[in-house]
């Protein structure tokens, strides 16, 4: 496709998505609800439209940008990060009322900072929609900046980015000069940037500020794996199973099971957790789901959304099960195994050992229960162009973050395939029958079944 054709296609997709969002916001506004934002629980069509606008906007920028535009964008983003770090360091955001404007000098007095610096820094962030100046000399929160006061974890994530990850990233070349190719966790860009022999994991245990910031950064900057799992798994042909039991092994939440049982009335889900306390978390999660679906009162009909959600929760069972222990559910049609994702604390060698233990625990069941399937779900590094550019950019970002902080890397698809092929089962082996990845997610599902060894 030519450059002009790609421009036209992106512009058309963006216009369609923007129209969908505008219609949703207008409807919300007419209903007496805030109409200037898209809530997380908006219809899937609207959330997809939002992602389409973001993706196509970035595609258009890439298609049109000249070298000078590229340098200028990097310069702006560099200054925005520095400004956000400055605002966070002096607690400036907390000095601005959530619902009103205030004079710059009053904020400067409260934060004990020079008013001229505050004005220049705030006006830079305003160009990105962070804060606003409703009238000359007065500053106020915007829809983008207010959550950083209401949810301090957002500011923690930004501070980790500016104080820890950015310096580490900028020392990547020096780390390569000093150590070359290495897998040692104490010889990475983080160590070079902060002149320490302690690994990132060790530093986390010693520095409370870093210990508080990392989970926030991981949550908001590295993205939600569970959403990606649901995106991939809901595309499988569940209807073909009929009335069947599905086991979600070592799940962190019951969200996937809740989504699938609500959509497919013939499925029964067993959700297994490694920790006892998770059951309480899931109970609260399921209660919240019922409330969200209007189940705090008896459903008005047997066919409405509330009634369907109530029936779905009846087909969902929670269990505790230790990692690698024998599987007590032996008659399921599908076993969903979550292969953990790489992190500064978990290398591929550790993930492989955990996955091997789980695969071995299910191997005999697959051999005895002909027709049972195993689905291994994980996050892998996509091949260039395999997913949307925004998804690939996040995947590359995660991979480089792991390298800079701990000399760890994201998994390759070939490594997961090799892992499945390495599982030995009496009288046969696991055979990969399907790989499923969507262009909107970094998650991938590997479907495998037992195949008897041919004699002779």
From Swiss-Prot:
Q: What happens when the gene is disrupted?
A: Strongly reduces the expression of dothistromin biosynthesis genes such as hexA, hexB, pksA, adhA, vbsA, dotB, ver1 and dotB, and the subsequent production of dothistromin.
Recorded superkingdom: Eukaryota
Task: Relate the induction remark in this record.
Answer: Expression is 8-fold up regulated when aflR is deleted.
Annotated transmembrane regions: none
Q: Where is the composition biased (Polar residues)?
A: 290-300
**MF terms per GO, please?**
DNA binding
Subcellular location per UniProt equals: Nucleus
Its function? Transcription coactivator involved in regulation of the dothistromin biosynthesis gene cluster with aflR.
PANTHER family the record matches: MONODICTYPHENONE CLUSTER TRANSCRIPTIONAL COACTIVATOR MDPA (PTHR43712:SF15), PUTATIVE (AFU_ORTHOLOGUE AFUA_4G14580)-RELATED (PTHR43712)
Protein name (record)? Dothistromin biosynthesis regulatory protein aflJ
* Taxonomic lineage from the root: Eukaryota, Fungi, Dikarya, Ascomycota, Pezizomycotina
């Amino acid at each position: 496709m030519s450059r002009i054709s790609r421009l036209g296609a992106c512009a058309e997709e963006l216009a369609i998505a923007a129209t969908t969002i505008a219609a949703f916001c207008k409807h919300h506004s007419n209903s007496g609800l805030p109409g200037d934002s898209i809530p997380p629980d908006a219809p899937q069509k609207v959330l997809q439209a939002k992602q389409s606008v973001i993706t196509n906007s970035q595609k258009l920028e890439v298609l049109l940008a000249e070298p000078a535009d590229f340098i200028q964008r990097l310069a702006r983003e560099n200054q925005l990060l520095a400004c956000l770090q400055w605002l966070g360091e002096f607690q400036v955001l907390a000095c601005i009322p959530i619902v009103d404007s205030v004079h710059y000098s009053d904020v400067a007095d409260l934060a004990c900072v020079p008013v001229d610096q505050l004005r220049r820094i705030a006006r830079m962030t305003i160009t990105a929609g962070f804060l606003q100046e409703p009238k000359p000399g007065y500053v106020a929160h915007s829809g983008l900046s207010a959550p950083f006061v209401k949810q301090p974890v957002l500011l923690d994530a930004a501070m980790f980015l500016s104080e820890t990850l950015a310096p580490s990233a900028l020392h990547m070349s020096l780390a390569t000069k000093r150590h070359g190719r290495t897998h040692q966790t104490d010889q990475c860009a983080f160590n070079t940037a902060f002149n320490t022999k302690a690994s990132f994991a060790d530093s986390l245990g010693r520095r409370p500020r870093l210990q508080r910031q990392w989970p926030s950064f991981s949550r908001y900057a590295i993205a939600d794996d569970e959403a990606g799992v649901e995106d991939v798994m809901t595309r499988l042909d569940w209807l073909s199973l009929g009335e069947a039991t599905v086991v979600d092994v070592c799940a962190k939440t019951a969200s996937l099971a809740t989504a699938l049982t609500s959509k497919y009335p013939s499925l029964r889900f067993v959700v297994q957790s490694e920790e006892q306390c998770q059951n309480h978390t899931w109970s609260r999660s399921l209660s919240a789901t019922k409330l969200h679906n209007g189940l705090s009162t008896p459903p008005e009909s047997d066919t409405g959304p509330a009634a369907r959600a109530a029936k779905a929760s009846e087909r969902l069972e929670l269990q505790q099960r230790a990692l690698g222990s024998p599987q007590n559910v032996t008659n399921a049609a599908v076993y969903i195994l979550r292969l953990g994702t790489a992190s500064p604390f978990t290398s591929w060698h550790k993930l492989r050992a955990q996955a091997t233990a789980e695969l071995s625990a299910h191997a005999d069941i697959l051999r005895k229960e002909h027709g049972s399937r195993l689905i291994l779900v994980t996050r892998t590094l996509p091949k260039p162009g395999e997913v949307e550019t925004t998804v690939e950019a996040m995947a590359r970002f995660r991979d480089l973050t792991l390298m800079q902080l701990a000399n760890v890397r994201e998994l390759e698809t070939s490594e997961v395939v090799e892992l499945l092929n390495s599982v030995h089962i009496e009288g046969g082996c696991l055979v990969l029958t399907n790989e499923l990845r969507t262009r909107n997610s970094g998650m991938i599902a590997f479907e495998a079944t037992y195949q008897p060894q041919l004699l002779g």
